[in-house]
Amino acid sequence: ENFKIKHTEPGLLSMANAGKN
């Protein structure tokens, strides 16, 4: 999960985290 957060921006982190998870 850490590598995803580093690749995603703070704003996209919420959408990416909810979408991927």
UniProtKB/Swiss-Prot annotation:
It is an enzyme of class 5 (isomerase). Residues 1-21 are annotated as: Disordered. It catalyses: [protein]-peptidylproline (omega=180) = [protein]-peptidylproline (omega=0). It comes from the Eukaryota. Disulfide bonds: none annotated. InterPro entries: Cyclophilin-like_dom_sf. Its EC number is 5.2.1.8. One of its GO terms (molecular function) is peptidyl-prolyl cis-trans isomerase activity. Keywords: Isomerase, Rotamase. Belongs to the cyclophilin-type PPIase family. PPIase A subfamily. PPIases accelerate the folding of proteins. It catalyzes the cis-trans isomerization of proline imidic peptide bonds in oligopeptides. This is Peptidyl-prolyl cis-trans isomerase.
